[in-house]
């Protein structure tokens, strides 16, 4: 499987059986910059703390950097 990986947001090969993930959360600059985003791959979908959103998927490049909605 190939997943996008931060910080460069490049597509990289991950080991067989791994999943891609997109993890998003707010920090002190959330109001100005939007949510922080971490892209990667892992053996299983990572467990996250409350307030952190995570989406896992198992297709090539299924975790692109999310686009920010314009108001």
UniProtKB/Swiss-Prot annotation:
Its main location: secreted. Disulfide bonds join 3-20, 14-41, 26-30, 45-56, 57-62. Expressed by the venom gland. GO terms for molecular function: acetylcholine receptor inhibitor activity; ion channel regulator activity; toxin activity. It is found in: Secreted. GO terms for cellular component: extracellular region. Keywords: Acetylcholine receptor inhibiting toxin, Disulfide bond, Ion channel impairing toxin, Neurotoxin, Postsynaptic neurotoxin, Secreted, Toxin. SUPFAM superfamilies: Snake toxin-like. InterPro entries: Snake_3FTx, Snake_toxin-like_sf, Snake_toxin_con_site, Toxin_cobra-type. Belongs to the three-finger toxin family. Long-chain subfamily. Type II alpha-neurotoxin sub-subfamily. Binds with high affinity to muscular (alpha-1/CHRNA1) and neuronal (alpha-7/CHRNA7) nicotinic acetylcholine receptor (nAChR) and inhibits acetylcholine from binding to the receptor, thereby impairing neuromuscular and neuronal transmission. This is Long neurotoxin 1. It comes from Naja nivea (Cape cobra).
